[in-house]
Amino acid sequence: MRKFFRGASFYILAFIIILFIVQNFGRPTQEIDELDFSEFYRALVNDRVTEAHLVERSVEGIWVNNNNEEMSYRSFVPEVFSEERLTLIIEEKIDQEGLRVSAAPPPTTPWFIELLPSIFMVLIFIVFWFVFMQQSQGGGNRVMSFGKSKAKLHKDDEGKRITFDDVAGLDEEKAEVEELVDFLKNPKKYIELGARIPKGILMIGPPGTGKTYLTKAVAGEAGVPFFSISGSDFVEMFVGVGASRVRDLFEQAKKSAPCIIFIDEIDAVGRKRGAGLGGGHDEREQTLNQLLVEMDGFGINEGIIIVAATNRPDILDPALLRPGRFDRQVMVGAPDIKGREQILQVHAKGKPLDEDVNLKVLARRTPGFTPADIENLMNEAALLTARKNEKKIKMETVEEAITKVIAGLEKKSRVISEKERKLTAYHEAGHAVVAKLLTHTDPVHQVTIIPRGRAGGFTMTLPTEDKYYVTKTEMQEHIVHLLGGRVAEKLVLHDISTGASNDLQRVSSIARAMVTQYGMSDKLGSMTFGDGDSEVFLGRDFTSKHNYSEEVAAEIDQEIRKFVEEAYMLTEKLLTENMDKLHVIAQALLKLETLDADAFEMIFTGEIVIGKDDQLEDIQPKLNVVKAKKRAAEAAEEAEVAKEDAKKQDVKVSLKKQEKEELIEVSSDKEEEKDNQDDQDNEENRKEE
C-alpha cells in the first residue's frame, strides 16, 4: 500500500504539472492591448475597430491604435451599460461594412477539468486516513492492518542463538522445561504414547529473575520459530482489534509450527474478568475470551506451545490457569548462593578482574539479588573502575558497587551541619549496636553517615546464608533493630527527629503482618484477619474486606501496639547497658564516616581503640593490617573447602568408574552365558537330526 501511494502520487503530480503547462504555455503568446470600456467605445465610434468577437460580455478583436498599428485588443462590457445602445452602434458599423463581427457560445470547461476538484478532495481524504492510521498504529503498520498481530518472529538466523548453556543459576527451572524442548524436537514419541505436552507454561517470578531469557533459551534449544509479543500489544483504541490480533497470531503460528508463542506481561490482558465498577463491555475481556478459545482449540499435534511471563499471578483469570491452557507454572525466583556465583561468572566474562576479586565472597554478599541486579552490579563496578582510570576491577570497587546498587549514589558533596552529623552518627550507631547485640539478626555489613539516595545515612546488614522462612523471634528482633536509631536519639540527644520515619513505617508493617497474616499473637491465636484478595482495577484499601468485628479490630491494634512497645523497651535496655559501645561507634563514624564489617567488629570488640585526638591517617593503617590478616584467613579457609570438594569429586569419579566396570563385567558374563546356551541348543538340534 505504501508503494502504491508513492507511485500514484507521482503520476497525479505529473498529470497536474502537464495540464498546467498545456493550459498556460501550450498556446502561442501574442501581445494584446487591454482596453477599458470607455476607450473601446470611442474606438468603435471612430471606426478604429475592424474586428469584434463577442463572448458573453467580453469583446476581443483587432483595432487600430494611436500609432495607426493594427493590434489585438480585449475589453469587457460592464452591466450598467445599455446593451441595446451597443447593439445599435455595432449594427450601424456592420451596415457600413467597416466592422466584422463574430460571436461564440459561453466557454465550457472540459469534463476532466471539472472533475479535478472532486478528485483532489478524495485524494486529500485518502492521504488523511493513511496518516491517521499510521499514527494510531505507531507508524509501523500498513493501512487497514490494525487487526494484524504485532508479534515479532525470531528465527535461528537472527542474532545469537541462546541455549540452556547461556542461562546460569536456574538449574531447577531448566530441568522443568527440558521435556518441553524434547517435545518440540521429537513430538511423535509423545503422540504415539497418547501423552499431551502442556499447552501453556506460565513463568512466574519477580522482575529481573530471567523469565524472558529462559524462554528464549527454550526456543533456541529446540531450534523452532519464536513469536514474542507483549500483553499490552493486543488492545488499542479500536473495538475488536484485540480479538482480531489474537486470531491472526495463532494463524501465523500454525503456519510456522512447531513453534513457541511468548506473551510477556500477560497480566495486561489476562486479568480477572468482571473487575471494576462499570457494567459495560470491556474490550480487554473480549481479547481474553478469544485467547482462551484459541489456547484450548488447536490440536495436540500442531506443535504450538504458549509460554507467558508475569510477576502478578494473583490477578490472572482462573480460566487462564486451568488444565488445558496454562496448566504448568514454573516459579523463577531469586537465585541461591550457588546460582549467584554462576551468574557472576557469566557477567564477569569480558571484564578484567583483579586477583583479589573473589566471586564466592561476592555471592555471599549479594543475597536476594536477581540476575538483573547482578548484571547491573558488574556493570556498575566496571563504570566505577573506568571513573578511577584503573585497568582492572578490584574487590573494593565491586563492594562499592554493591552498596551503590542497594543504597544509591554516594553524596559526599552535600554540606551537612555538625549537629546533623552527630544526630546521624548516633542514629546509625544505635542500629548497628543493637544488631550486634541481638542473636537472631543479620550481621552488620556496613555503617555510614554519608548520604546516599534519599537517606542521610544507613546501616546495612546482610545474612550469612539464604533464608526462606522467618521465625517469630527473628521478626521481633528485626523490630528491635529498626527502633535502635530512634531510641539512640532519645537517650543521647534527649530529642527525636524525622530520620526514623521509614524505620517506623517498617516497624508498623512487620507488627501488623505478625498479627493479621501470620497468626503470631498469643491473644488472638492462629488466625488471619482481612481478605488478601481485592479488585485488580481498584485501590486495595477501597476494596479490602474486613471479615472481623470492630471489637476484634481494636484487639488487633492492641496486639500491634504490644509488639512495638515490648520491642521499644528491649531496645532501651540494650542501649542503656551498652552506652559505652554506642559512644565508641558514633565517635568512629564521626571520624571515619564509613565502617565496613571488619572495622565495625574491631572497634566494637575493642581490638582497635580510637582516641579523641586520633586522625584518619592514624586509624586507617591499623584497620588495613587487621583486614589483611582476616582476608588471608578467609583465603586459607576457602582453599581448604576447595580441597575437600576436590576430594569428594575424586571419590564420585572413582565410584562411577567402578560402577561402569561392574556393568561391563556383568554384561560380558551375560554374553558368555548366552553363547554357551546357544552352543547347547545347537548340539541338541544336531542330535535330534
From Swiss-Prot:
Which key words tag this protein in UniProt? ATP-binding, Cell membrane, Hydrolase, Membrane, Metal-binding, Metalloprotease, Nucleotide-binding, Protease, Transmembrane, Transmembrane helix, Zinc
Q: Membrane topology type, per the record? A: Multi-pass membrane protein
Annotated transmembrane regions: 4-24, 112-132
A GO biological process this protein is involved in?
Answer: proteolysis
> Record-annotated residues binding ATP?
205-212
Q: Kindly list any coiled-coil regions of this protein.
A: none
Q: What is its EC number?
A: 3.4.24.-
List the ranges whose topology is Extracellular. 25-111
What does the entry's cofactor note say about binding and number? Answer: Binds 1 zinc ion per subunit.
- Indicate whether Metal-binding appears among the record's keywords: yes
Query: Disordered: where is this region?
Result: 661-689
Binding residues for Zn(2+): 427, 431, 503
Q: What class of enzyme is it?
A: hydrolase
Q: What GO CC terms are in its UniProt record? A: plasma membrane
Q: Name one Pfam family in it.
A: AAA
Which cofactors does the annotated protein need, by name?
Zn(2+)
**Cross-referenced SMART domains, in alphabetical order?**
AAA (SM00382)
Basic and acidic residues composition-biased segments: 661-673
Q: Which residues lie on this side of the membrane: Cytoplasmic?
A: 1-3, 133-689
Q: Which domain of life is it from?
A: Bacteria
Q: Which GO terms describe its molecular function?
A: ATP binding; ATP hydrolysis activity; ATP-dependent peptidase activity; metalloendopeptidase activity; zinc ion binding
Known role = Acts as a processive, ATP-dependent zinc metallopeptidase for both cytoplasmic and membrane proteins. Plays a role in the quality control of integral membrane proteins.
PANTHER family found in the cross-reference section:
ATP-DEPENDENT ZINC METALLOPROTEASE FTSH 1, CHLOROPLASTIC-RELATED, METALLOPROTEASE M41 FTSH
Q: How does this chain assemble? A: Homohexamer.
Name of the featured protein: ATP-dependent zinc metalloprotease FtsH 2
- The scientific name of the source species is Alkaliphilus metalliredigens (strain QYMF)
- Gene (name only): ftsH2
